[in-house]
Amino acid sequence: AIQSVKEKKADIVISAGNTGALLVVAKLNLKMIENIDKPALSALWPNKKGMSVVLDLGANIECSSKNLIDFSIMGASLYTSLYPDEKPNVALLNIGSEELKGNETIKETYQILNEKNSDNYNFEGYIEGNHLMDGNVNVIVSDGFTGNVALKTAEGTANFITSELKKSMTGNIMGKISSLLNISNL
């Protein structure tokens, strides 16, 4: 599959296999973007206004500010390839929105991105986990540890809400009537 992408016979690889192994094989066989050291796992993340690109979701547990800046470039490039009429807004996932919050790497990255003028994206600063789905930011950048925790938390929350909705709609006669009345909205 990686060879097909290399030979331009395919555009993407989808795998249910080991993510780490896929990244290693891809990095060894495919050309990286110039001056970018590390690949990142990314995903389209639904939000109130459409979709956001979120990266890194687990490939790089520890990152330098250079890596996070590279992820900003990669995420903005991916977003622009999907939505060519929009200039993406990029933010760093952090524990607060204030400039002084976060570890040294995230604060250093903030300073660099805040001073850098990019033609490819607008830097919006920090985004907190409770605003990931607001839709005000198109590209959300984090290290792989933080991104993976956010992803797993969102997945678990979605599963919990789905389970509770199913129980409430099938648990008694009123729930069943309510679900029938709301079937077109669900």
Report each predicted region and the residues it spans:
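Short glycine-rich anion-binding loops that position phosphate/pyrophosphate groups of nucleotides
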Residues: 18-21, 28, 97-98, 145-148
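Glycine-rich phosphate/nucleotide-binding loop
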Residues: 27-40, 47-54, 136-140, 144-186
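Glycine-rich phosphate/diphosphate-binding loop of Rossmann-like nucleotide-binding domains
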Residues: 61-129, 138
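Mobile beta-alpha loop/short-helix "lid" or hinge segments that flank ligand
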Residues: 40-52, 81-86, 90
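Short acidic, glycine/serine/threonine-rich loops at helix termini
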Residues: 24-29, 66-67, 102-106, 151-154
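N-terminal glycine-rich phosphate/adenylate-binding segment common to multiple enzyme folds
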Residues: 1-38
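Glycine-rich oxoanion-binding loops at beta->alpha junctions
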Residues: 1-9, 61-62, 126-134
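Short beta-strand segments
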Residues: 15-17, 44-45, 54-58, 93-94, ...
